[in-house]
Amino acid sequence: EIVASDWSSDVCSSDLLLDNKSILITGGTGSFGKAFTKYVLDNYNPRKIIIYSRDEFKQFIMQNEFKQYADKLRFFIGDVRDKERLTRAFEGVDYVIHAAALKQVPACEYNPAEAIKTNIHGAQNVIDATLDTGVKKVVALSTDKAVNPVNLYGGTKLVSDKLFIAANAYAGSKDICFSIVRYGNVAGSRGSVIPFFHNIIKNGGTELPITDYRMTRFWISLQQGVELVIKALEESKGGETFISKIPSFKITDLAQAMLPGCEMPEVGIREGEKLHEIMVTVEDSMNTYEYDKHFIVYPQMVWSESRRAVPTGKRVAEGFSYSSGNNTEWLSVEQIRELLKTIDLEK
């Protein structure tokens, strides 16, 4: 039997990395922010966790969900577009997790200037606020869509990634480190295929539309996303991109796991959508090293000898790439069915 934990990262909390530390999460009321907050509060003893986000109502809901941790949690209303507010919020913070983004692909296509303000200018504001305060480490969340981007959202995240990697050059003598964590759609996250299918089934639908029968995706749980961020906080020296090793699945197999024997009309690929999620390109592979449960793409720039990240993993073969289409590990229909039980689709 396959369970989600079989693909869990080997996070080592023995060095109590987050104990007595102050951590701020931009976009902290989202699904990642909530899961990260819960994981840290359950496994460490942080000084405080600051949730920095725009929506007062979502903060109110999260405050109620985390009532028992009230003494450890702070809620700041603020936008990553507002550098002054960010700088004030970063005072006294040790680690920043940058999760705030406009991430719905169609919304970004339709409102490109807004996506640029949040995803690109917001990233630069986080960097500037970090350099102006005492923050030690920043981990920015990226996406497979930033790799060979075909839509505006992916384009903005590519620029954001480049900004965070280059930001290490501006740290100078300060002990500051910026790194990136890249993963695909979290299984069951808002706006992804699992809730979409679930809704059709719930409303009595008997067929599940597939954009392209060849389409594949990675399966990553929220827990694995959180653990990869902890891994980056533990190990990053500056400029690395951390990528989880996770299994792939075919969208047709997902449909059969959710509604066995259903009709699957092929409706055509949507604008800005890829057949396969790409995590590491052939070009990236020159600087990519493999570890037990993840890959790291190391930066091409070296800022100073003391800040150089020395790879201890195995260099990947020439011509290597990592996508949901060429993965070595695949989920069967039965395995998908088991993993679906771990997702709360009624939330």
Report each predicted region and the residues it spans.
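Single conserved hydrophobic/aromatic residue that forms the stacking wall/gate
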Residues: 1-12
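C-terminal substrate-binding subdomain of Rossmann-fold SDR/epimerase-dehydratase oxidoreductases
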Residues: 209-347
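N-terminal Rossmann NAD(P)H-binding glycine-rich loop of SDR-like oxidoreductase domains
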Residues: 21-41
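Conserved Rossmann-fold NAD(P)-dependent oxidoreductase catalytic core, especially the SDR/UDP-sugar
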Residues: 95-98, 102-158, 162, 166
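NAD(P)-dependent short-chain dehydrogenase/reductase
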Residues: 152-153, 158-236, 247-261
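Conserved Rossmann-fold cofactor-binding substructure of NAD(P)-dependent oxidoreductases
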Residues: 74-95
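Conserved glycine-rich Rossmann-like NAD(P)H-binding loop of the short-chain dehydrogenase/reductase
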Residues: 45-58
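Conserved residues in the N-terminal Rossmann fold of short-chain dehydrogenase/reductase
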Residues: 53, 76-77, 117, 266
